[in-house]
Amino acid sequence: MKISICILLVVTTLAVYWPTQDHEFINYDDKEYITENWNVKSKLTQDSITWAFTTSHAANWHPITWLSHMVDYQFYGSNPKGHHLTNLFFHTANALLLFFILFRMTGTLWQSGFVAALFALHPFNVESVAWVAERKSVLSTFFWFLTMWAYIHYSKKPGVKRYSLVALLFALGLMSKPMLVTLPFVLLMMDYWPLRRLRFEQDEGPEEITENYSGKKLEFWHLVWEKFPLILLTTGSSIATVIVQRSGGALQNIEAFSLSARFTNAMVSYLDYLKKAVWPEGLAVFYPHPGNALEVWKGVLCAIALVAISAVAIKFIRKAPYFAFGWFWYLGTLAPVIGVVQVGGQAMADRYAYVPLIGIFIIVAWGVPELLAKWRH
């Protein structure tokens, strides 16, 4: 059955996104990243590789992403078909990795397949796949999932070699897109559910996992300390990102967007992402930031709603750990791009939801069957 689900994921993903191979490059960042970037068009040379690791071009430091574009140009030149197919390859691989990761952690076939299918086919993710310049999203997520896989392997039998692989894959992900700064937080949540490396005495949650961790229940602060090397990598990546975004003029100052405008937009955006996830209409390449035109009371109401949902998630964390895991995955992974630290002039962006919505998909996949089972009884 696992093979059937994998085949179905591959076939449906390719069927939906195959037309992208006939798309051209566009004038929104594709020039800056590929068609008019002479370092990328130089292909893989000593100078271009050095440039990839030292440049702040496009107000980002993501050398692995630059190298991937150079490899594409090495094989496909200026033909956009190959560049689009590379994005599609990574997105398809990501869907398969997500399925295997969830299945390995939880042992539940259909829920894992459902989450992977939503991830593969949700309209919110079209921007990340169909836009060549957004290679960094699909590439960094590829390393995100590989890091999770390596961490699961490490949790079964902790050791330096296994942890080194986790750190290496995490570093490659950070060098693809700094969105991975929240991954140590996700790994810590995984320690509670589904890996069960941390468990309270009164836990009542389901025992999906028996063989996929070391069997040792560890103290919370021990697990936090375990993530310290990853936190160091996160800190370094964050500092580098702030420096290059500030030097590139992407980081907005308080005069451009006040603190109240940032807070209000951030709170409203959290719920707007959810609304578009449920009913994906009005998707756009750019959502202008409303600035002070957005009433503060809307932000306050949205903040109250977010706190209320978070309180419910914590209250039922032992009976429904998947709900807390999915909800805080969503809140946490979206936090770096929610707009408190404002980069650019957008209020939100479809590409920012590529990883965060996985948390919501997990809530739906595990929550709906559980609710239906309770209603039947």
Where are these regions (language model features)?
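Polytopic membrane enzymes that build or remodel cell-surface glycoconjugates and lipids
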Residues: 1-377
